[in-house]
């Protein structure tokens, strides 16, 4: 199976044994973008899911395209996931009144999950704190308060435990929102991460519990003996901080070999640390640049080399999508602007597609030969 995801939020996934495919795109901004993804990923239909209220206290809308079959009804599965209301998630004392401004800001009981863009400047936070302190009963309904309300939501400002003025949601709480364990992106012996780096990494990642739901058929196949009970082989492209691997681990899918591709060294170390703790027996191979494995004859050699040691059961990843994101305000004339799949980063989607097709071709070739693939 393979899947792809990106910073602006695209995910595409497809399983090779058996044939299973899934894709997610973040807030499809243009129909032509949706059609490009759809046509390159075997014309599978798109499925829209908002994680908020179903899998997380965070609102995170995505569209998915999958050929995985056999999911439980989403409401039935989600009913088994404990999603806390905002006040409970924050640990707000039940005997203290909830601030009026917070009732307006978080009226839908869902915090924001675009945390990569929500690193508020100290000056902005101070200004908002001063305004709320001077207007303690405000519900932020006045036209003049529209900018304050917007910043509170964008920056994920929540009532502080020691008072009613806003404070920035802690990184540990953001990790929980995104479905990771506390400290997943934290520093360890091998590396040090700053608050800003952790927020950026989390903002670029999957909402783990949502992806876990979409991957549940993999567990069913493993339990039924259709996938190796000792563990599957996963090729994770644009791996980030390992959201897909964490999702598989959460639902109980065992891992045997994991090949990850991620250009950022800090994110690779986060995944390395997680693998050592949670999948110490799995073979972990790291790649840096997907282009090294997706161009010319070397791409076929790369896939064959992996499959010589056993079939690839899941290909999963997330190419950068800032060039197709509605949040991108840079001119389309610039490589970093909203220029579609011709942009500096989003064109890597096609590298993902190339590798996925090579995997399928090699699997089919080995099947015709009666091989192990």
Show where each model-derived region lies.
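Conserved active-site and SAM-binding loop architecture
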Residues: 1-373
């Amino acid at each position: 199976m393979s899947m792809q995801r990106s910073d602006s939020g695209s995910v595409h996934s497809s399983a090779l044994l058996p044939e299973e495919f899934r894709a997610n795109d973040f807030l499809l901004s243009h129909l032509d973008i949706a059609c490009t993804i759809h046509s390159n990923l075997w014309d599978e239909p798109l499925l829209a899911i908002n994680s908020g209220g179903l899998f997380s206290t965070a609102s995170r809308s995505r569209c998915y395209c999958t050929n995985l079959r056999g999911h439980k009804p989403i409401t039935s599965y989600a009913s088994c996931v404990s999603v806390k209301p905002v006040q409970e998630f924050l640990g707000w004392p039940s005997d203290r009144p909830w601030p009026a401004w917070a009732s307006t800001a978080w009226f839908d009981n869902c915090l924001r999950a675009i945390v990569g863009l929500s690193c508020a400047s100290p000056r902005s936070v101070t200004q908002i704190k001063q305004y709320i302190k001077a207007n303690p009963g405000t519900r932020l309904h006045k036209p003049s308060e529209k900018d304050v309300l917007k910043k509170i939501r964008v920056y994920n400002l929540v009532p502080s435990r020691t008072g009613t003025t806003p404070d920035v949601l802690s990184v540990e709480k953001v990790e929980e929102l995104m479905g990771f364990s506390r400290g997943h992106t934290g520093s360890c012996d091998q590396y040090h991460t700053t608050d800003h780096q952790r927020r950026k990494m989390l903002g670029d990642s999957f909402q783990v519990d949502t992806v876990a739901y979409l991957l549940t058929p993999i567990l069913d196949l493993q339990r039924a003996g259709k996938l190796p009970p000792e563990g599957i082989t996963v090729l994770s492209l644009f791996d980030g901080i390992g959201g897909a691997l964490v999702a598989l681990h959460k639902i109980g899918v065992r891992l045997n070999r994991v090949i990850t591709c991620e250009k950022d060294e800090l994110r690779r170390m986060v995944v390395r640390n997680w693998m050592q703790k949670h999948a110490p027996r799995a073979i972990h191979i790291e790649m840096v640049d997907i282009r090294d494995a997706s161009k010319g004859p070397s791409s076929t050699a790369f896939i064959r080399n992996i499959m010589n040691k056993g079939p690839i059961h899941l290909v999963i990843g997330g190419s950068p999508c800032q060039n197709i994101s509605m949040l991108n305000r840079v001119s389309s004339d610039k490589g970093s602007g909203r220029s579609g799949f011709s942009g500096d980063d989003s064109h890597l989607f096609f590298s993902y597609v190339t590798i996925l097709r090579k995997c399928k071709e090699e699997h089919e070739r080995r099947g015709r030969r009666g091989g192990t693939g």
